[in-house]
Amino acid sequence: HGEGAWDYLSRNERDASHFDSLMKGLSEKGGAERSLVALGASDAAFAWSELPQRSRVIDVGGGEGHLLAQILKNHPHFVGTCVDLSDVAARASAYLSNVAGAEAVAGSFFEQLPAGDVYVLKWILHDWDDDDALRILQAVRKSMTADA
C-alpha cells in the first residue's frame, strides 16, 4: 500500500478492528488458564508477587490492554497504564474502563513513556530492526522510576 502498517491501520477502522481481534485471539489462545495473557500475568512468567504494593505497570504498545487487565486483576494492589497509538489507546480506554487501577494513554514507544516500576513489552521488539529496538529500550530506560 506504500505506507507502514500502523499508518494504514490508523486510517482503516475495519482492518484495525480485525487486527485487534487477531491480537486478542493470539493472546487468549489455549483457554483462560493457558493463554499468553494468563501466563504473562502469572508468577510463573514473572515474580509479580514480589513487587511492592502500588507498583505501576506500564504496558508498552499494549493494544487494547488485555494483558494489563489480567495483571491488575491478579494483583489488585498494582496500578497500570496501557500505552499505544492514539486510535488504539481510545479502544484500550474503553476496554479498561471497568478494570480498577487501569488507564490508557496515547503515546509512542519511541518517545517519553509514563513513569513506571515495571515495563511490559509483549510482541513489540521483534517487529523492529536492532537500531529501532534499541531506541524503544532507551525510551523505556529514560522513563523508569529509580527503583524500577
Predicted regions located by residue number:
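Conserved adenosyl
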Residues: 1-148
